[in-house]
Amino acid sequence: MFKLKQDIILFLLFLCLLSCSTNPKSPIDPKKNIFITKPEITFNIKNLPKQINVFYLNSVIDPDSTSSLIQGITENYYYYKEEIGYAPELNFIDFSDNVYCMENMTQLKESFSIGLLFNEDYSLLDNNCYQRLLKLKGLLVTKNKITGTKDKKLREFHISREVDITNLLDIAKKNGSIRAIIIDDSTTRDKALIEKIWNNMDGEVVSSVSSERKISSQKLLAEILLLEQSKVRSRKLSRIIGVQIKNEPRKREDIDSIFLSTSLPNARSLKPALEYNLADNISVYLIPSWGEEGNLTDNELDLEKVVISEMPFLLNTNTSFQEINSRNNSRNFAIGYDAYELVLLLNTSSRRNFNYFGLTGLITNKYTSIQKKSLHAKVINGKLEYQDYGD
């Protein structure tokens, strides 16, 4: 009996050691600022699609967005063509014409498709075309969640700024933030959304304002920090007692954090004004605008101590596989690049569940959904110090 128990214990120890030895090591290397890597998997070309159809709604308002998405796809296409010889037939189809959409559905049904519905409302599609679209095999890249995608053959890569906001506010909450001021601008206009998310986390919004171009940053912050009220009270008291009172404003003690949802230029203007108005000890969190492209530099002194949530590709991180031309440094390029990567991963039977450290962030594939988390960084002495992906 003792021998049997001993054998069982040894067997369990063996299984434990085996599981530890096969536990994959994270491919990212924070010491080298490497947060973007290729999946650690050997692709079997025979299992990958021989034809990939990329359909999109060509935006008249912002054609550059569609162009950047397609550039990202083709960049990754040529990477795998050169590295492993995988070069499927790549077709690009504009579905702006609903008649053309219906005519091509039969062809699309027989192959793998990438649907770029990121910059246009999918409701622009004819209902018949839309319903057939939901029966395709492939990947939909969307800005707004698609309803009716229950077919396991059609997966959705949902790119949502709201997720970035939620993750960053979660970090603020863990850092002890409770009472906050929210500032958005004309490129975001989402202070109401941020307030709703923060309230759901049991946080309190003391004030929420929009930074408009006609109002200077110093005047805006002086108002929300109640510095003008302090001056008015001092003048009134001086008149009552007949003695000149020196006004020494103190920072508001009823707030502990400020959430900026603005363009990068606006954030660079607001943060120094914040310090000038005696609120330098308040924690500042930034979710950069998606409506206005801008690049972080290697010397962001105006954003000192600000915590930023962003795609790693736009946080000046390094990649472990290739240097990507800086002229392609855009959000939509990163989305297109990762979409093509997902095509390969979703068609590899041995890797149903995976973690991919992509250009847009940490992408996790689970049975029910594909999820993405952005990277977080804090500006220290003008340099970005990378923290981690949101929990």
Predicted regions and their residues:
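Periplasmic-binding protein-like
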Residues: 110-121, 139-142, 179-185, 231-241, ...
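Structural motif
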Residues: 88-108, 164-167, 215-225, 240-244
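Segments of small-molecule ligand-sensing domains
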Residues: 323-388
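Bacterial signal peptide processing site
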Residues: 21-24
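Signal peptide-proximal N-terminal region
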Residues: 43-44, 70-91
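Extracellular/periplasmic periplasmic-binding protein-like sensory domains
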Residues: 202, 221-235, 253-257, 271-338, ...
